[in-house]
Every structure is written in structure tokens, then in C-alpha cells.
Amino acid sequence: MTQTFDPSAFLATCSGRPGVYRMFDADATLLYVGKAKNLKKRLASYFRKTGHAPKTGALVARIAQIETTITNNETEALLLEQTLIKEWRPPYNILLRDDKSYPYVFLSDGTYPRLSIHRGAKKAKGRYFGPYPSAGAIRESLSLLQKTFQVRQCEDSFFKNRNRPCLQYQIKRCKGPCVGLVEPEVYAEDVRHSVMFLEGRSNALSDELNASMEKAAMALDFERAAELRDQVALLRRVQDQQSMDGGTGDVDVVAAFVNPGGACVHLISVRGGRVLGSKNFFPQVGIEEEVGEVMSAFLAQYFLGGVDRELPSEVIVNVVNEDFPALIDAIEESRGREMTISHRVRGTRARWQQLAVTNAEQALAARLANRQHVASRFEALAVVLNLDEPPMRLECYDISHSSGEATVASCVVFGPEGPIKSDYRRFNIEGVTAGDDYAAMHQALTRRYSRIKAGEGKLPDVLLVDGGKGQMSMARDVLNELQVPDLILLGVAKGTTRKAGFETLYLNDAAHEFTLPGDSPALHLIQQIRDEAHRFAITGHRARRGKTRRTSTLEGIAGVGPTRRRDLLKHFGGLQELSRASIDEIAKAPGISKKLAESIYANLHSE
């Protein structure tokens, strides 16, 4: 604890009412936000001479100032605490890294509605189903619906401008409503069945499909009967996978597990007795190391963190603590509806609870095992580089382009716990000779390290460059120009066979050349980081190239600016469909005159 902070003097004037407290260090950086039923009693507990966990002791040692806000009750304190945590993200609080809105299945209005994934505000007209706990869970449901009922999932702009069915029709994933290959009444029936499935009425849907199958067979419509038989078989398979015996309501099953290496919270989402999916959360554990504290902090941030998440009627948890009564009041007050938190459960609910606990334990064990695996590779690299201790931060750069087109440089960052994706960066390379990888790398490194020198970001301990002597020399020139000190430069080039395991490595200056055995953990780490930089560069390049190619063909046409280009491509569903359109069809697009349509058509067919 700093000498400038006197806890005795502070506690002498501290209120014993409910409220929120904020702890700051000597630089006025917010360290921790907490709530209390009795502020004075809670804050006094921090300054006991014994009994602190290591993280709590580290926090107390940094305190230079404490501010408090008195509230009318504990519920108000909890709501204010969550607002401050979300705004400031203090380092000693438990923090959820996931803050995205959860996805829904969206069914649009119209004669031929579309099924799609939706995040964010529900502004479009139609129906929303969910939320689903992950994008993977929602894609699984959409894939099943596509196979079973063949409701379209294409963009409206693509749908409106088809003159022949697409590949989805050929592989029996769509019935071709875009070109009139299915009657509106038949399509509406498929949509109705999809809605029944999404609402969790799978048993009623199975009964209805079975009855329709028997009716079709009696009418000797064997083709229709076979189609319905396949739908029933698919549906039964999914029911077996997703059903929760004895469950009919909307329930979230949440289990928290904590050990010295970290924490995991596993959430299973059940809607209408059907499992929509599950998700692991690995919160940044602050000073609360008890599993009950982790659970209450998770639920508070999950349901009060500002993200639009559906409130289930019941949440089953594996642990509770004294904060739960105030937590339930705060959630119900904030969300405007009742919710039950259950802990001591029996029968089916007890099995759900245990399943969530098992998943949380296994997920954390797997995460820690992977972290230890990466850490051991860092230790091996330290031996190779003759370092006293493992490096804490590695950066790797790569270049991707197609014959010089849409050049993108990538920067990926790794630490002993694995990739640090929040620090990944891409650089769109401009103003260099097409295909000049040296110039592209020079520009990327200059931009990156100029920003770091200006205080934006951290210097790595090791800079890994994917390339041979030329790239190494160029990287060294950049570091010298910018006067970047004490940075280990490591180059990796493919060997003569160009196979993994035969790489040639260069250390600091290109003259220091060596290789590592194919089974070397240090080499495996280098390969892992290099491959990740390559992947990140390629995905960025493809996105940039696709955007360029979608617009470049239209850029030289007088009267077609950026807005019209975007509107044209959106109207026709892409450049390929626009190229197939006639002059009259182009003229029907919003804001396009007959004369401009003729000019667009002529430019698109000039070759």
C-alpha cells in the first residue's frame, strides 16, 4: 500500500450504508470497482493484516485513493457497479471478454421469406427466433432447416435477379422460388414447418409430417411420401441430439469452475425443451477467486452488461453466494420481468446441472493444457535464442497478394499463453511496385513501429519475419532507421525442399544461419506463428481483392460514383448478375436512366 493513503483516516469517515466503491492507484488509474451492503465494513476487510489472497494483496498494495457512491439499497449498488465495470473495465475485476450480441434466426416477411442469421437491433419486419449461444449453434440449425424444408437463405438482391436456379437447388437445399419452381402455397407450408421447429414444437411437427406422409401414400403420391419420410427421419435424428428429457421451458444452465490456473463458465441454452447449443466463457479472473464470486460476477455482467440477451424464465446454477438476492432483484428491475435462479435441483435438472459442471471442468483443463503446451515451446525457444528467460511477446509479419494485386501485410502476436488476437493488425499496402514484397514489408514494419515509438502498442521481444536474407536485412534497416532498441530479429525461410521441418533460420543478422531438428518444440512454435501470420494475411488479401474486383469494373464509367456502384451491386446481387442483365433490366435499378444503363452495358461488354 502506498504511503500517501491512510486507511484508518479513510475508514473513520466512511459510511456504513449500501453503495459502490472505486479504487485508484497513484496515477489515478481505476483498479477495481466493487459494491457493498455496508461500505465501511466491506472496505475495512481489505486492510486486515492477514488472510488475503495474493491478488487481493497486490491490489491493496497499489491503492492510493478510494472513492465511494452511496445508494438507496444493494440493488441500486449492483446496477451502478455493472455500469462502471462495463465503462472502465478495471484490471482487478472479473471481466467477460465476449461482449457481442447473441445471434438470432431471422425469418423475413414476403411471399417467399428468407431464413438468415441476425445480430443487433431488431428493425427489419419479420420474426426472430433465439437467441442462440453461438454462431456455430445457429448455423447448425439453419443447415438442418435447409436440408429438411429447403427454405431459401440467399440475399434478397440475389433472389430478385435470378433467371435460373443456383447450386442450392441442384443439391436439394432450396426449391427454387426465385424462378418459380415451387408454388407459393407449398413454400408457405415449408416455412410453417420451419417455424414449428424453431419454436421447439418438434413433437407436433413430427406428428403432422407422419400424418401427411401416410396421406400421400394412400393417394399413391409416392414421391411426396418419400420426401416427407426423409424429413421425418432428419427431424427425429435432431430430436435425439437436442432433446432434454423432461424439459419444456426456457432455461439457461450455468456452471462455474475455478482452479489456480483460471476460471471457466459453461452455459447450456434450452428453449422449449430443446438444446440450442452451449458455450464456454473464460472470464478474466480478478480478485474474486471463490467460485461463488465468479458465478455472481458472470451473471451480473451477462444479464446486465448492456448486450441484448433474452432473459430465460429460469437459470440453473451450480453455486450461489450472498449476492444472489440482490442480483435477482437487479436483473428483474433492469429487464422488467421475473426470473428464477435455482441451485438445489433434482431429477432431470440435476443431470443438466452436472453436465454443465463437467463441461466447465473439461474446457478449463483443455485450455490450461494448451497454455502449458505453448509455454513449453516458448521455453524451448529461449534456449535456442540463448535467453535467460522465455520471451513474453513475439510478432510475426507476412505479405499476401495476387500478382501484386490488393497487397496486404499481416502482423500476428503471440505470448506464452497463445495468440493475442486483440493485438493482431493488417496493413493495406499502397504506393509500391506490384509484387515487390521487400517494399511491402518495409512499409508494414515502418507503419507498425512508428506507431509503437509514438506510444501506440508494445514492442515485442522477438520479431519473426517470414523470409530469407533479403527480408531480414530490410527489417534490420527499418529497425535501425526508427532506432528501435533491444529487439531480437528472427528470420524463417523455407529450405531447399520447401517442406515443413526443413526451414532455415536467421538470427539478428543474416550471416547467422542455422536449422533446428524437425521435432524441435522451438521450431514448432516458429511454424505455428508463421502459419498464423500467413493465414491472417491471406484472409485480409482475399477480402480486399474481392472488394476491389466488385467495384473496379464500374469505376471508369461516367455517372457511376461510389454510391451508385454500391446500389447497383446490391440491387443485382453482384457484378456477375449485373453483367448478365440487359439494358432494360439495368434501367429498372433505382437511380439509373436509360442512357446511363446503355453506358453501363457497353462498358461491361466492351471486351
Curated annotation (Swiss-Prot):
Q: What is this protein called?
A: UvrABC system protein C
Q: Gene Ontology terms, cellular component aspect?
A: cytoplasm; excinuclease repair complex
Using the record for this protein, list the coiled-coil segments as residue ranges, or answer none: none
Tell me which UniProt keywords the record has, alphabetically: Cytoplasm, DNA damage, DNA excision, DNA repair, Excision nuclease, SOS response
Locations listed in the record: Cytoplasm
Q: What does this protein do?
A: The UvrABC repair system catalyzes the recognition and processing of DNA lesions. UvrC both incises the 5' and 3' sides of the lesion. The N-terminal half is responsible for the 3' incision and the C-terminal half is responsible for the 5' incision.
Where the record annotates domain UVR, the positions are 203-238
**Which N-terminal stretch is annotated as signal sequence?**
none
Q: Which PANTHER family match?
A: UVRABC SYSTEM PROTEIN C, UVRC/OXIDOREDUCTASE
Claim: Nucleotide-binding is one of the keywords in the record: no
User: Which family does the record assign?
Assistant: Belongs to the UvrC family.
Underlying gene: uvrC
User: Which HAMAP family does the entry link to?
Assistant: UvrC (MF_00203)
